[in-house]
């Protein structure tokens, strides 16, 4: 059997970006044949990627990009917060955000088919899955293209905001974006709050008010009051500005001669059910798998 040297392992790693131990195993299996080892690794990484594809991705990052008259916000998911801090994962996230802004894909499928690094976005994603050993997915994105101004704000890479606004001061856009990240409004104004959210809030208010035992006309006023309070709490323009509790966002914008046209807010993993594993069962499964190898 041919001797496997450190330089051979390093060369294979440089070609495939695979972990060192995987490179050494492939070279051993290929009896030192670099080309064969590279082929074996690509097969292994492909299998690794396909196995990982079925796993839940509830961690991840939000990335943003603004260039020219377009801006984007994207959410990419992985399985653990450890990988969410991985340099390769973060670099891929930033690249995807830039592609969304500059190429204007219609949806995630179109984005995945865009050319990247001599291949496609999806091929690069799969290579990343093989390299880090976790499923990676592009969950969603939003793109703003406008003659107005665009501001973005990222809070710890887990919360991202993009805002389209008008006004002379860039600080206004930054302040609004930061406020949205902190207060998480669901709509720009009360009139924009989705009907299903209002209906849910009304049902809850009706149940609470009915328990008071007060006359029907009083109950009706209590319900209306609760709904109006809710609308103010979840609509951006009616919220109290986080940097000045004497102003609403609407008042702050008016004083700055500015206006917000629209915004988007992404929170990593929002709406994704995380897998809750039984630790003992997971260890037992790993032991059983090891015995079969």
Swiss-Prot record:
Outline the segment boundaries, as ranges, of region: Involved in Mg(2+) ion dislocation from EF-Tu: 80-83
Q: What is this protein called?
A: Elongation factor Ts
Question: Where does this protein come from, organism-wise?
Answer: Burkholderia lata (strain ATCC 17760 / DSM 23089 / LMG 22485 / NCIMB 9086 / R18194 / 383)
Primary location group = cytoplasm
> Which InterPro entries does this UniProt record tie to the protein?
EF-Ts_dimer_sf, Transl_elong_EFTs/EF1B, Transl_elong_EFTs/EF1B_dimer, Transl_elong_Ts_CS, UBA-like_sf
A single GO cellular-component term on record: cytoplasm
Keyword Repeat listed? The answer is no
Q: What UniProt keywords apply to this chain's record, in alphabetical order?
A: Cytoplasm, Elongation factor, Protein biosynthesis
What HAMAP family would the database entry show? EF_Ts
- Signal peptide range: none
Entry similarity comment: Belongs to the EF-Ts family.
Q: Name one GO molecular function term.
A: translation elongation factor activity
Q: What is the lineage of its organism?
A: Bacteria, Pseudomonadati, Pseudomonadota, Betaproteobacteria, Burkholderiales
- Output the Pfam families linked to this UniProt entry: EF_TS
Q: State its role.
A: Associates with the EF-Tu.GDP complex and induces the exchange of GDP to GTP. It remains bound to the aminoacyl-tRNA.EF-Tu.GTP complex up to the GTP hydrolysis stage on the ribosome.
The subcellular localization recorded is: Cytoplasm
